[in-house]
A protein has these predicted regions:
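Hydrophobic, lipid-facing positions within transmembrane beta-strands of outer-membrane proteins
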Residues: 38, 52-58, 69-71, 83-89, ...
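Outer-membrane beta-barrel "beta-signal"
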Residues: 54, 157-180
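Outer-membrane beta-barrel initiation region
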Residues: 28-63, 172-177
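Residue-level signature of outer-membrane beta-barrel architecture
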Residues: 60-64, 91-93, 132, 146, ...
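Transmembrane beta-barrel strands of outer-membrane/channel proteins
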Residues: 40-44, 73-77, 103-109, 142-146
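Repeated loop/turn-to-beta-strand initiation elements of outer-membrane beta-barrel proteins
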Residues: 38, 65-70, 97-101, 136-142, ...
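Cleavable N-terminal export/targeting peptides
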Residues: 1-34, 171-180
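Solvent-exposed loop/turn segments connecting transmembrane beta-strands
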Residues: 44-54, 75-86, 113-121, 151-159
């Protein structure tokens, strides 16, 4: 019971904090709704401990808005054959038309391969990404994420990743939004 309360508590704290931070900033940029994105990322996995693995990600970031939140889904893999499929919510916080901070929260299924044992197949990921927004709305950024099982198991080492991200508007790839 304590584990579920702990997870719920931190999810609520994250979402309320993101809402409080993003709502006033987002409203000032509401006239320019963002497109959906295909994000590719490459970087270091388990950077706090070993930094002995490379991580690659592919994400779809929807343009559907649920208040200030936008859903996303993705897949991550490492050269250790660890894999993680996930979905969650994110918030765009615009500090200017070019500078975007994007906190996100996701939950998904993890398979360790020959990589790090994170103690449970269910993993939660929190991430902060700081990106530069180009004229065509594509973004290049740096992200820092933490992934752990939030004490669903007594083995809860967690891991961190530092990633270089490039998000391209989906309509530039497919010629239209995925929802059209």
């Amino acid at each position: 019971m304590f584990k579920q309360q702990f997870i719920f508590h931190w999810c609520v704290v994250f979402l309320i904090s993101a809402l409080v931070i993003a709502l006033p900033v987002r409203i000032s940029h509401a006239e320019s709704a963002e497109p959906d994105f295909l994000n590719v990322a490459l970087g270091g996995y388990d950077v706090h401990d070993d930094w002995n693995a490379v991580e690659a990600r592919l994400e779809y970031r929807s343009n559907m808005e649920l208040s200030v939140f936008r859903p996303f889904t993705g897949f991550m893999t490492t050269n250790d054959r660890s894999m993680y499929g996930y979905g969650g919510v994110l918030v765009d916080v615009f500090f200017s038309p070019r500078i975007v901070l994007q906190p996100s929260l996701a939950v998904g299924a993890y398979a360790k391969g020959s990589g790090k044992d994170l103690g449970h197949w269910i993993q939660f990921r929190t991430q902060l990404e700081l990106a530069w927004r180009f004229d065509d709305r594509s973004r290049a950024g740096l992200s820092l994420s933490h992934m752990s099982n939030a004490h669903l198991s007594s083995n809860n080492q967690g891991t961190e990743a530092v990633m270089l991200n490039y998000a391209v508007p989906f309509d530039r790839i497919a010629g239209k939004s995925i929802w059209e």
